Regions:
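Alpha-helical transmembrane segments and immediately membrane-proximal extracytoplasmic
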Residues: 3, 7-472
Length: 472
């Protein structure tokens, strides 16, 4: 029988060390699990940071935009009250004329110094979010105060311009400046700019759902879940601050408007087609007027805003209802109690004058938006349709006001080509959520009509013009 020799102490030590080495070296599967766990923690931390940054962005944007709204809403009634005394005080007219001339010169200088503040600011913001336009931090520092002051002066001067597009650009500018503080611009700057734009729209309209949809439907932004979280936190914070800190409520108190009865449902597609065609005509007129003024104006940039200001001066003492974006005008439509025939005679010239003045106000690279005038014109056209149907005894008399809402939705969607955003926007501004299903029908048919007429969305055309001008 062979006896096996016992191992020496040296061999025993080597064997133990080999086994110990095998125990301490992790397997590839263990390494992979550890790496996956580390990646999950990193993603969770990054998303948490994005959410916090989005919340801070929304709060900052709400403060800037609500300050703008407070300044405008406080000054505008005082100016109109002062102008209404022109019959008793002869010096009101020449003093206001001098003020508008100086305002036109100031705005011209402001636009010449900072060209990116011209217009609504939405096309510029879309180009930045898409990575097709790059702006330095120094430029953002100039854009924010220039847009704030420029839009305030132009709207208080009476031009038919809105605050909402400028609020989107100011929200993007506020977010871009905050992004520099995060020192994350290279990785998440465009996400924060989109979040600021959405927060700006939310604070301007009091419409968080529309602000969220606007980023993805109109700006055509594609973000990760972290980016969506940042935008969502921004609009939520902006909405809460606008509602509960600054106490802004509904822009159009139409929450008592009821949807059409079942027997009148067939009018919805008709309304969609009419508003779609009207939006196409306005789109072409807006671009045509803007291009014609740019080609044939005898004024330099310093004075290009003077002609619209002079028209605003005349209207201030003749038809002041068409001045400004039109929030008060839309709110007054629901209170019309005249017979349908008298209402039509009142609404038709008012709508034509508002359309013409809005087209002319947007010339000269004036800092100001087209969204609010667009909604006002849609409301006027909707009121015309409702009163016409009421006059023809096609519509029950108590439901004609519903067409004010559908006019706003259809006209907006025809121009912007964002049906979900347009529907959510009007519903959140008015509180008339009972009309939501019918408004969706009008929105999609208006969008289909505009597409069938092969008319590009208005912001696509304005965005293309900016790209061409910067290449030159």
């Amino acid at each position: 029988m062979r006896v096996r020799a016992a191992p020496c102490f040296r061999d025993i030590g080597m064997t133990i060390s080999e086994h110990a080495g095998k125990r301490t070296r992790p397997s590839p599967k263990t390494l992979q699990k550890s790496m996956n766990r580390s990646k999950r923690w990193t993603r969770a931390i990054n998303r948490t940071l994005l959410a916090l940054e989005g919340a801070v962005t929304g709060l900052a944007c709400a403060c800037v935009i609500c300050a703008f709204r407070l300044a405008r809403d406080s000054a505008s009634p005082l100016i109109m009250q002062w102008l209404s005394g022109w019959k008793q005080h002869w010096w009101v007219m020449p003093l206001w004329l001098l003020t508008l001339i100086l305002a036109a010169r100031f705005l011209g200088h402001l636009v010449k110094r900072t060209p990116l503040i011209s217009g609504s600011g939405i096309p510029q913001t879309e180009l930045i979010v898409q990575g097709r336009l790059h702006i330095s931090r120094h430029d953002w520092l100039r854009i924010l105060p220039s847009k704030f002051v420029g839009c305030l002066v132009s709207t208080l001067g009476g031009l038919s311009l809105g605050r909402e597009g400028p609020c989107i650009q100011m929200g993007a500018a506020t977010s871009a400046l905050l992004t520099g503080l995060w020192e994350r611009f290279s990785t998440s700057g465009h996400i924060h700019i989109a979040a600021g734009a959405a927060a700006g729209m939310t604070a301007a309209f009091g419409a968080p759902v529309a602000g969220l949809l606007f980023v993805f439907e109109e700006m055509k932004s594609r973000f990760t879940r972290g980016g969506f979280l940042a935008v969502g936190c921004a609009v939520t914070t902006a909405a809460l601050a606008t509602r509960y800190i600054f106490r802004f409520g509904l822009i159009f108190p139409f929450q008592n408007i009821q949807a059409l009865p079942l027997g009148s449902i067939w009018l919805l597609p008709v309304m969609g087609v009419v508003m779609g065609a009207a939006g196409v005509l306005y789109n072409k007129a807006l671009l045509g007027t803007k291009n014609a003024e740019a080609l044939h104006t005898p004024f330099s940039q310093n004075w290009r805003i003077l002609p619209p200001m002079l028209v605003a001066f005349v209207l201030a003492f003749t038809v002041p209802a068409v001045l400004g974006g039109g929030e008060d005008l839309v709110g007054s439509l629901i209170r019309i109690e005249d017979a349908p025939r008298q209402a039509l005679l009142l609404l038709l010239p008012l709508a034509l004058l508002k359309i013409a003045f809005s087209l002319f106000s947007y010339t000269g690279n004036v800092p100001g938006g087209i969204l609010m005038p667009m909604l006002c014109i849609g409301a006027l056209l909707g009121a015309l349709c409702g009163q016409a149907l009421n006059y023809a005894a096609i519509l029950p008399p108590e439901t004609w006001q519903t067409f004010i809402l559908y006019g706003m939705v259809g006209f907006f969607v025809s121009l912007v080509r964002a049906p979900l955003t347009g529907t959510a926007l009007v519903m959140e501004m008015s509180g008339a959520f009972s009309c939501l299903p019918q408004a969706v029908v009008v929105a999609f048919i208006a969008s289909w009509t505009a597409n069938a007429l092969r008319c590009p969305p208005v912001y696509d055309s304005l965005r293309a013009a900016i790209v061409v001008s910067r290449k030159k």
